[in-house]
Amino acid sequence: MTTAGSCGRNGGFMVSIKEVAKHAGVAISTVSKVLNGYPNVSEETKKKVQDAIKELNYIPNSIAAALSSKQFGRIALVLDPNRQTQAIDQIFMQYLVGALDKAKELNVEVVTIFPSMIAGMTAEEITRSFLSQSISGVVIYGMSKEDKVLQKLIREKQFACVVVDAPIVNSRTTSISIDQEQAQYDVAKKTVLDDNCKRVLHIAGRRDGYVTDQRLKGMKRLVKDLDLTMMVRQGDFSELTARNVALKYAKNKDVVVCASDLMAIGAMNALIDMDIFRPVCGFDGITLMGYVGKQMNTIRQDFYSISSRAVEEVHQLMNGGEGHQVIMPHSIVKMYYKDIIC
């Protein structure tokens, strides 16, 4: 717990927790409670303390020690296993193993941060928490467009950041992804031309996803280039939702283009249940596609390599590198059972 002995700097002078308390007009114990995330502090009081901390540039002893120690240089991996279902845990594990292997190679320590661990925290609170853990680099996987807190954390440039699948770049932030727009265009074009399709049902991902917008942009370009018609429905990257969309709309379409493999599996099973054939394509290249029975085109992403490169990039930023955009390769494949069995 942060105590009265904590200190910071303001224009070269040490700032004590006592001065923060005085500036905010609260007790020292109240400042300590805010710093340590105690729940029994009103929002009004919390704001007073946070404003005082910011104005005085107060840094607790635990953070100051981390800043000056040789341990300062850990990398936080911000990723959410709960955003996946058990069917595509493969993506989460490939991200994790890719990051851990590269971190071992670079001799840096990584810390896994799940969203539940920082839920409800402000950008300032996350900053203090990360600094207290000697974190100076952050890799964020699949950030939502609605996540204003993490976006603020990136804008403030306190940490070297790499964002996976989000087009955000600044002097201390690198973006890494495949070319989502082109990949969606490529796999949909092949599927459409293979079966001479004209009427497209596109099952898109979550509305708050950066990749959803990029993949939809690819589809709109394809529709224009090939003079197609297209109906777009949200599938939320859910197998069940995509199944229900296909049951309702696929019968009157020539092809079903899905923005993820899991949704493609849901759509294909809906078509099988309706006893009709429509070509379906997915996106990601997960192993589960090989078990469906009906082979579908998909985009293969190398999640291991993407995550490994993300850690390499954040390490470069931590050592003075400049933020930039990294485009990783993709390929169109069909997943066959004989190719995935061990």
Which positions does each model-derived feature cover?
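N-terminal helix-turn-helix DNA-binding module of bacterial transcription factors
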Residues: 1-73
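Alpha-helical recognition/docking segments in bacterial nutrient-uptake
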Residues: 2-12, 74-189, 249-251, 255
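Short, well-ordered beta-strand segments
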Residues: 76-78, 201, 257, 281
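Alpha-helix capping/helix-boundary segments
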Residues: 145-146, 208, 215, 262-264
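Hydrophobic alpha-helical segments within soluble ligand-binding/sensing domains
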Residues: 176-202, 239-247, 264, 301-319
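An alpha-beta-alpha
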Residues: 187-226, 322-340
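Flexible loop/turn connectors
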Residues: 251-342
